[in-house]
Amino acid sequence: MGRYSRESDNVAKSCKARGPNLRVHFKNTHETAQAIKRMPLRRAQRYLKAVIDQKECVPFRRFNGGVGRCAQAKQWKTTQGRWPKKSAEFLLQLLRNAEANADCKGLDADRLVVHHIQVNRAQCLRRRTYRAHGRINPYMSSPCHVEVILTEKEELVSKATDDEPAKKKLSKKKLQRQKEKMLRSE
């Protein structure tokens, strides 16, 4: 079992999943993970399926050099976005794994929220491509490690309301006038 970079506050109400050395682009996966952070589990799954179908885009905020603009990015208050299909598929699979772990622990899947998701660079894999005049150039891939922690959302307790509304504070002058009116009416 690998070490996670962060531990949950309430271990009994959370579940984990991780994927080491995934053959998927680090930069695309990082942006996709940032988009689903703090989302409810069901919404995150719907969102990733929509990204695969190109119904919603992933906003590119950090690794956005050369990324084109798209209208769907407006809902994220940015202009640049893409639809990284492979990253979305990998993260969707990881969320399914975490959901299965939650089910095994007896947690309610409808109340789960993506509490923590982190994407780290893995060791680059080296291949080669052959160029003109007998030269050879590297053909590198940038895999990544992904870890996710889902936490059950706690019920918010609403503030108790008093039966009587709070009385207005009155100045001494107004209290005096009210007393005078009461005396006159009697």
UniProtKB/Swiss-Prot annotation:
GO terms for molecular function: structural constituent of ribosome. CDD domains: Ribosomal_L22. PROSITE patterns: RIBOSOMAL_L22. It comes from the Eukaryota. The modification Phosphothreonine is found at T161. Signal peptide: none annotated. Keywords: Phosphoprotein, Ribonucleoprotein, Ribosomal protein. The keyword rRNA processing does not apply. The modification Phosphoserine is found at S158. This is Large ribosomal subunit protein uL22.
